[in-house]
Regions:
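PLP-dependent amino-acid enzyme catalytic core
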Residues: 2-232
Length: 232
């Protein structure tokens, strides 16, 4: 059983959680097989494979976590409305998942969000509220809406069901490439890499999980070095 640190508490994600998430996502998301990269293989002297989640439904891996969270809560019978804060990919994932089960969704986006992303989110059935100039301000507004309406907030990464959904990527990688040595994962908020690592390591503890984060926003790298959560 893997333990994932969360503000002094611990998320407990077992392999069965990822398998349950995969069942919920079956026949919903696209099956995207691994693709070999001749260029990167030549550059590194290793066999390099790519998983193009930009070709996923709604254009991002984010739909995995959002759909798993919303479907799990919907099955429990007490989900009537959801709220999320996002500048794009999570917004579309939540909107798509909510509309799939007829649940009202409200997405709070910063005013600087490109109109194309606003329109795409509305196209999946969400009500969009523009608030603030940065994500933190949109997040604060989303929390206000939840407080006022009783809707449930769908966090983009700090949620075990969201992590379980994102971690289904690891199940697919190991299905297609059982003897993979290393998995490189982009790291932003940490939901994707947490899910992938927790899932993959339970199947094969020898797999190395390498997080890659932008130098200009190294919150996870700083947190690992400090042994506690640190901002960028």
């Amino acid at each position: 059983m893997k333990k994932i640190l969360h503000n002094g508490d611990r998320y407990m994600l077992e392999l069965k959680d990822f398998e349950a998430a995969a069942d919920r996502l079956k026949n919903v998301i696209h099956n995207i097989p691994l693709s070999t990269s001749a260029t990167f293989s030549a550059m590194t002297g290793a066999e390099v494979y790519l998983k193009y989640e930009n070709q996923q439904k709604t254009g991002s891996f984010k739909v995995r976590g959002a759909y798993n969270k919303i479907m799990k809560r919907y099955a429990e019978g007490d989900l009537h409305a959801v709220v999320a804060s996002s500048a794009g990919n999570h917004a579309q994932g939540v909107a798509f998942a909510a509309s799939s089960v007829g649940v009202k969704s409200t997405i709070v986006m910063p005013r600087s969000t490109p109109i194309a992303k606003v329109s795409a989110t509305q196209g999946y059935g969400a009500d969009v509220v523009l608030a603030g100039n940065i994500y933190d301000e949109a997040y604060a507004k989303a929390c206000e809406i939840c407080e006022a309406t009783g809707a449930e907030f769908i966090h983009p990464f700090d949620d075990e069901d969201v992590m379980a959904g994102q971690g289904t990527i690891a199940l697919e990688i190991l299905r297609d490439l059982p003897f993979v040595d290393m998995i490189f994962v982009p790291a932003g908020g940490g939901g994707l890499i947490s899910g992938v690592a927790a899932c993959a390591k339970q199947i094969n503890p020898r797999i190395q999980i390498i997080g890659v984060q932008a130098e200009g926003a190294p919150a996870i790298a700083n947190s690992f070095r400090a042994g506690e959560r640190k901002p960028s």
